[in-house]
């Protein structure tokens, strides 16, 4: 039983790790590249030269640079969030692999660690799509919109556009997150190979019989 259960969880963690790593490292790369690129654009366009005319010199239009500055800060927060709260399914299989399993006691200890890692993976996936994550992202994007409109004295429509753009990126991040560990944990708790302690009750076996004798008959159902 221990071997079968351990094989199930090990296979599940290893199978889910490649896509989890792609999602986690991919979004770190996207957020990092966005933060750096927008930061450079904000710095280079902040003091753009104004065309000199005989009329009074107009105020430089910094709306593009301001948008890039706000976007850079938002993306930097995205990188920080992914680093502070790592995506456990991306590394769980690697953490389990070095543990020995040569004796029954070692296999039992490894199984306990495997179950713990699988539950951590499922919990992290649920948190990543949970209400708290949605509210935190909405708060950051709302703050970015307020800064655009209030701090930079821009129209509120510009603030709404900033909020909507940031929220679209946040939702793409949330709903592209893998959820395999959550499904694997449900399968394991519902009755994986050798997991007799968590298996679902077997359907009761029904038997029927029909008896005939002179003057009558009988029907018997056993369950």
Model-derived features: where do they sit?
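N-terminal Sec/ER secretory leader and immediately downstream segment
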Residues: 16-69
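Mid-membrane cores of alpha-helical transmembrane segments in multi-pass membrane proteins
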Residues: 28-37, 70-75, 135-143
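Glycine- and aromatic-enriched membrane insertion/assembly motifs of diderm outer-membrane
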Residues: 42-47, 65-89
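Hydrophobic alpha-helical transmembrane segments
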Residues: 59-73, 155-165
């Amino acid at each position: 039983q221990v071997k079968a259960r351990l094989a199930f969880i090990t296979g599940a963690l290893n199978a889910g790790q490649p896509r989890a790593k792609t999602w986690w490292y991919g979004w770190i790369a996207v957020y990092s590249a966005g933060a750096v690129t927008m930061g450079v654009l904000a710095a280079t366009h902040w003091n753009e030269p104004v065309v000199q005319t005989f009329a009074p010199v107009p105020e430089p239009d910094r709306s593009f640079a301001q948008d890039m500055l706000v976007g850079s800060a938002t993306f930097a927060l995205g990188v920080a969030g992914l680093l502070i709260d790592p995506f456990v399914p991306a590394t769980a299989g690697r953490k389990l692999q070095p543990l020995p399993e040569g004796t029954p006691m070692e296999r039992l200890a490894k199984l306990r660690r495997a179950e713990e890692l699988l539950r951590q993976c499922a919990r992290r996936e649920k948190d990543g799509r949970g209400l708290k994550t949605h509210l935190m992202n909405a708060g950051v994007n709302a703050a970015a919109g307020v800064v655009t409109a209030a701090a930079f004295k821009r129209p509120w429509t510009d603030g709404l556009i900033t909020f909507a753009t940031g929220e679209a990126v946040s939702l793409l991040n949330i709903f592209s997150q893998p959820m395999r560990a959550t499904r694997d944990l449900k399968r394991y708790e519902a009755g994986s190979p050798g997991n007799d302690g968590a298996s679902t009750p077997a359907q009761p076996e029904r038997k029927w019989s029909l008896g005939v004798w002179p003057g009558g008959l009988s029907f018997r159902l056993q369950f």
